[in-house]
Amino acid sequence: MPHSKLDDLPNAVDRWPMIGSAGYRTVKWGDMEVGLTTCEALDATELYKHGGLPGGVCPCPHYGYIFQGRIRAHYPNTDWPDEVAETGEAYFFPAGHVLIYEEPTRALELNPAHALQMCMDAMNRAIEKRLAAAEPAEEAKAGS
């Protein structure tokens, strides 16, 4: 059976480049993905929306534990109240949420790999769109 120390999980900066080289470590075991996220404060609302996720929400349920920090799960277009998990707490956020890392956070997550891949792909599409939109503006600025 697979096992690993958290800091020995493979670096996956290519999967989530916006949080930096040490910010995301992950490995797929069977149909689950084990990930260690270390990030600054981050609101994923625009990433989910501009990345093309249906309804602008994450399709992946997240099971995790927060070593440090605070994560808010917001459930747009529902009557569900926001949920907050913070240092020392285990959590479950069902699909249909937007994650907001309210402060620097270090969290372990166990997620269904396919659903997480859809979320990661959408965030990367949003980043690519943002960068592509910035390039013409930079060129116009340089040409003036």
Identify the residue ranges that each predicted region occupies.
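A short, N-terminal "cap"/entry segment at the start of jelly-roll beta-barrel domains
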Residues: 1-47, 54-55, 83, 132-144
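A short, polar/proline- and glycine-enriched secondary-structure boundary/capping micro-motif
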Residues: 46-49, 83-86, 118-122
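Structural motif
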Residues: 63, 70, 96-98, 104-106
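Short acidic-glycine-tyrosine-enriched beta hairpin
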Residues: 77-96
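Double-stranded beta-helix
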Residues: 100-144
